[in-house]
């Protein structure tokens, strides 16, 4: 039984997307009472064209933020940058920024990939 499982794991290739930086930092914005960070998302999946960004607390509950694109189209093997603004009163609550693949086709693998980066304290 275990041999079959190990074999399947070895032959299966898991493609996900990438997000950088690993430990983003908030910086002051030119707008009053807002802080800003930027993350880059790289699409490694040919079955996914859209990605959603989100900011979360330590319990993975969403925190309100502002970005030009919450959901953004990213072609296969391309990058996109998300600029995220947050009210500075939430700075201590925001622990993670995550990107999640958005499935749009029935022929896709059916697997949603979600990658989170942790904010440095």
Task: Describe every region a protein language model picked out.
Residues 40-41, 55, 86:
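Hydrophobic beta-strand positions in extracellular immunoglobulin-like domains
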Residues 62-92:
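Intrinsically disordered, low-complexity Pro/Gly/Ser/Thr-rich segments with frequent PxxP/GP/PP motifs
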């Amino acid at each position: 039984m275990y041999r079959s499982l190990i074999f399947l794991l070895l032959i299966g290739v898991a493609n996900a997307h990438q997000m950088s930086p690993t430990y983003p930092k908030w910086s002051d914005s030119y707008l009053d009472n807002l802080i800003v960070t930027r993350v880059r998302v790289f699409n490694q999946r040919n079955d996914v064209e859209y990605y959603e960004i989100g900011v979360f607390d330590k319990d993975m509950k969403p925190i309100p933020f502002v970005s030009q694109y919450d959901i953004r189209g990213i072609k296969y093997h391309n990058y996109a940058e998300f600029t995220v603004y947050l009210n500075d009163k939430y700075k201590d609550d925001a622990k993670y920024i995550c990107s999640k693949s958005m499935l749009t086709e029935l022929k896709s693998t059916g697997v949603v990939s979600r990658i989170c980066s942790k904010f440095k304290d």
